[in-house]
From Swiss-Prot:
PANTHER family assigned: 40S RIBOSOMAL PROTEIN S15A (PTHR11758)
Protein name per the record: Small ribosomal subunit protein uS8
Domain of life according to the entry: Bacteria
Gene symbol of the encoding locus: rpsH
HAMAP family: Ribosomal_uS8_B
GO biological process: one example: translation
Function: One of the primary rRNA binding proteins, it binds directly to 16S rRNA central domain where it helps coordinate assembly of the platform of the 30S subunit.
Molecular function GO labels: rRNA binding; structural constituent of ribosome
Length: 128
């Protein structure tokens, strides 16, 4: 049983980047798809696709950029210890070279976008 599907998703992407794999398939969830869309928008991924394996059973196919831009994905807010930040406390990852992903009242978004919109929320991931 997977207790933290988001951490499992992050590990799968990070392991694929280390192994220089082009694509991975993970069990689908709405939150994983939204996180992948933010990573796609920020240029870390090439393509994402929702695939139906069987009736009402889906997988998320994630295609990484060719030279893997991801060196580390760190899960910040965990099921046992949630981390919430206001827009003034959103961290600057590696002086702007990385991004953080937040879950806000307006959806899942990158930290710099949330800061610009003056939105705080749950700090999900740091990618660099």
């Amino acid at each position: 049983m997977i207790t933290d599907p988001i951490a499992d998703f992050c590990s799968a992407i990070q392991n694929a980047a280390y192994a220089k794999k082009k694509e991975i398939k993970v069990p689908y969830s709405f939150l994983k798809e939204r996180i992948a869309q933010v990573m796609l928008h920020e240029g870390y991924l090439e393509k994402i696709e929702k695939i139906e394996v069987r009736k009402n059973i889906f997988e998320l196919k994630v295609v990484l950029k060719e030279p893997a831009l991801i060196t580390k994905i760190k899960r910040i807010s965990k099921p046992g210890l949630r981390q919430y930040v206001g827009y003034k406390e959103i961290p600057n990852i590696l002086r702007g070279l990385g991004i953080c992903i937040l879950s806000t009242s307006r959806g899942i978004m990158a930290g710099h976008r949330a800061k610009r919109m003056k939105l705080g929320g749950e700090l999900l991931l740091a990618i660099y």
